[in-house]
């Protein structure tokens, strides 16, 4: 069994986990988001799709946040070292470099974490177990073995920056999307969940 899976195995929903905000302060319990639809992405500020995905994350949060969507971003440096800034440097990198132009995320960003390997954040260990492969590309894998910097390697590992996990209002992961699936194209799935109304979970 891959490391961190044991810690996540007993969890039934994302509400069992917490993460520290990028700006610092006390950890945020995902249980505080009960009843919301969550879109969770591992992000990086120096990736080829940073501009596209960050701006689309902002757009979804702007349009659907008032109806119950919460977008959560987790910076990760495990893929091509494309999030090599310190936590306190990431917001300035986004504002002045990429996407640049004064960009500010309107969604929740958390401290850098690992999503694969022995040091994986328990939330991502849980998400990977719940949804072992992206629904749009079940064979998605890290394409260059030289870039694998973690151990152990598992079949359900996140393959690159900007993989997405959609979580229902009961905290149960519903769908995983590959890096190639544009963030904005998840909107119909989010809309379907929002139209179901609040959960009593």
Swiss-Prot record:
Write down the CDD domains for this protein, in alphabetical order: GSH_Peroxidase
The cross-references to InterPro entries, in alphabetical order and at most eight, read: Glutathione_peroxidase, GPX_AS, GPX_CS, Thioredoxin-like_sf
Where does the protein end up?
Answer: Cytoplasm; Mitochondrion
PROSITE patterns linked: GLUTATHIONE_PEROXID_1, GLUTATHIONE_PEROXID_2, GLUTATHIONE_PEROXID_3
Locate the active site: 47
Q: Which residues carry this modification: N6-acetyllysine?
A: 86, 112, 146
Instruction: Report whether Transmembrane helix shows up as a keyword of the record.
Output: no
Q: What class of enzyme is it?
A: oxidoreductase
Modification type N6-succinyllysine: residues: 86, 112, 146
Q: How is it modified after translation?
A: During periods of oxidative stress, Sec-47 may react with a superoxide radical, irreversibly lose hydroselenide and be converted to dehydroalanine.
Q: What is its main location?
A: cytoplasm
GO biological process terms, semicolon-separated: arachidonate metabolic process; glutathione metabolic process; hydrogen peroxide catabolic process; lipoxygenase pathway; response to hydrogen peroxide; response to selenium ion
Pfam families, per database record: GSHPx (PF00255)
Mention any one GO cellular component term assigned to this protein in its UniProt record: mitochondrion
- A molecular function (GO) term: glutathione peroxidase activity
Which of UniProt's keywords are assigned here? Acetylation, Cytoplasm, Lipid metabolism, Mitochondrion, Oxidoreductase, Peroxidase, Phosphoprotein, Selenocysteine
Heme is among the record's keywords: no
Q: What is its EC number?
A: 1.11.1.9, 1.11.1.12
Marked site positions, Subject to oxidation and hydroselenide loss to dehydroalanine:
47
Q: Which PANTHER family match?
A: GLUTATHIONE PEROXIDASE, GLUTATHIONE PEROXIDASE 1
* Family to which the UniProt record says this protein belongs: Belongs to the glutathione peroxidase family.
Subunit comment for this entry?
Homotetramer. Interacts with MIEN1.
Annotated function: Catalyzes the reduction of hydroperoxides in a glutathione-dependent manner thus regulating cellular redox homeostasis. Can reduce small soluble hydroperoxides such as H2O2, cumene hydroperoxide and tert-butyl hydroperoxide, as well as several fatty acid-derived hydroperoxides. In platelets catalyzes the reduction of 12-hydroperoxyeicosatetraenoic acid, the primary product of the arachidonate 12-lipoxygenase pathway.
Q: What name does the UniProt record give this protein?
A: Glutathione peroxidase 1
The lineage, from the top, is: Eukaryota, Metazoa, Chordata, Craniata, Vertebrata
């Amino acid at each position: 069994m891959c490391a961190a899976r044991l810690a996540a195995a007993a969890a039934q929903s994302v509400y069992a986990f917490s993460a520290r905000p990028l700006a610092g302060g006390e950890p945020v319990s995902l249980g505080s988001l009960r009843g919301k639809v969550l879109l969770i992405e591992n992000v990086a500020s120096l990736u080829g799709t940073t501009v596209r995905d960050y701006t689309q994350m902002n757009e979804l949060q702007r349009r659907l946040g008032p109806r119950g969507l919460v977008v959560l971003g987790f910076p990760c440096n495990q893929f091509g070292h494309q999030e090599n800034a310190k936590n306190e440097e990431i917001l300035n990198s986004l504002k002045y470099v990429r996407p640049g132009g004064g960009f500010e995320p309107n969604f929740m960003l958390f401290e850098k974490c690992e999503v694969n390997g022995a040091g994986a954040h328990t939330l991502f260990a849980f998400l990977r177990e719940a949804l072992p492969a992206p629904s749009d590309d079940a064979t998605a894998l890290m394409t260059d073995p030289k870039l694998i910097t973690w151990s152990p390697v598992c079949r359900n590992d996140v393959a690159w920056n900007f993989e997405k996990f959609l979580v229902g209002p009961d905290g149960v992961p519903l769908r995983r999307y590959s890096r190639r699936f544009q963030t904005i194209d998840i909107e119909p799935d989010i809309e379907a969940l929002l139209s179901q109304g609040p959960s009593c979970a």
